[in-house]
Regions:
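Intrinsically disordered, low-complexity repeat tracts enriched in Gly/Pro/Ser/Thr and acidic residues
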Residues: 1-340
């Protein structure tokens, strides 16, 4: 009845972007006794915890360009003001992550390029030590790139995410697709008989959720509601099916869906002109006509009555067009024909 073959691709979600590490708290640095009398100029300052500073100072406070090696093996090279990182600088963490960009009052803030030890790279805005504003994030693991807005270290706002299998253009929230968006699939990258081509609709917490339209390579198209990535609720499904002669017949089902499949309840099914059938309007169960319904055939035959498992069954009226006249027949508990 509703012979629909739909392979659902695994939803590809962006990996969480790497968090920016905190820099060392410079208030923890204490000068050794022999360095306390140094006041101004370009000097080397030694600290009691195996760290050192080489650069300019003013009244014993770091100011201007300098190099600071910290007790945890982090290193900073750049501008200082009033003993704090301030201006352009490069901060290298002991694990290999590198921040190159702006600092303000000891905090990473402004524009920067951050290279992570896992190969990921971020270029864009930074606020209060976190990715913020417009930026570009390249993920080595997924061979993907995100170009868009960030907030609180996460992809949030409008952006474009792309890898070898698909391109998403839309809204994000806390690193996940959330809001209106468009997915463009690259079908040659999917090992599927009928790969997807495009999805336009709503997302929630990384899943297709809400109204949307999804199209497939063979012409199949679903227009309706989604819940957590699956067809759920009211929708319309248009799909082609090749017959024995190689001709493509189009069917259109409108009704209720549950867990990706046509569900129990009222719906309608329309066939293309190439088939024997015209339309069905009535009740469905398990993808078959069940309950009350009306079936029309292209030869003029109509049946209005009860169905069971896709066949005439129970009370109903059958109108058959025979040459120049129509016969009306009442039937009860009689199997007339199976609808293919």
């Amino acid at each position: 009845m509703l012979e629909i073959e739909i392979e659902n691709e695994e939803l590809i979600s962006p990996d969480p972007t790497q968090k920016v590490q905190k820099t060392f708290d410079l208030t923890q640095l204490k000068l050794s006794k022999k360095e306390e009398d140094k006041k101004t100029g370009k000097i080397r300052m030694l600290y009691g915890n195996n760290s050192e500073y080489f650069g300019r100072v003013d009244k014993n406070k770091k100011k201007g360009r300098g190099e600071l090696t910290l007790p945890n093996k982090d290193k900073y090279v750049g501008k200082f003001n009033n003993d704090l990182f301030d201006g352009k600088g490069v901060y290298t963490w002991a694990n290999g992550d590198i921040y190159e960009g702006d600092f303000k009052n000891g905090i990473m803030e402004g524009r920067a390029c951050i290279t992570f030890v896992n190969g990921d790279v971020y270029e864009g805005g930074v606020k209060n030590g976190k990715k913020d504003g417009a930026g570009v994030y390249k993920s080595k693991k997924m061979d993907s790139i995100y170009n868009g807005m960030f907030s609180n270290d996460e992809c949030t706002g409008c952006g474009v995410w792309e890898n070898e299998k698909l391109r998403y253009d839309g809204y994000f929230k806390n690193g996940k697709r959330d809001g209106e968006g468009v997915e463009i699939f690259y079908p040659e990258k999917y090992n599927m008989k009928n790969p997807p081509l495009k999805f336009v609709g709503h997302f929630k917490e990384g899943e297709r959720d809400g109204l949307g339209v999804k199209e497939f390579k063979n012409g199949l198209k679903y227009d309706g509601n989604f819940v957590k990535g699956k067809r759920e609720g009211q929708g319309k499904l248009v799909w082609p099916k090749e017959d024995r002669n190689g001709e493509i017949n189009i069917k259109v089902f409108s009704g209720n869906f549950k867990n990706d499949k046509p569900a129990e309840g009222k719906g309608s099914l329309i066939w293309g002109p190439e088939t024997n059938y015209n339309s069905y309007d009535g009740e469905f169960k398990n993808g078959k006509f069940n309950g009350k319904g009306k079936l029309k055939k292209n030869d003029g035959e109509e049946y209005d009555g009860n169905f069971e498992d896709g066949i005439y069954h129970g009370f109903g009226k059958l109108k058959k067009k025979m040459e120049n006249y129509i016969t009306v027949i009442s039937i009860k508990k009689y199997m007339m024909a199976k609808v293919n």
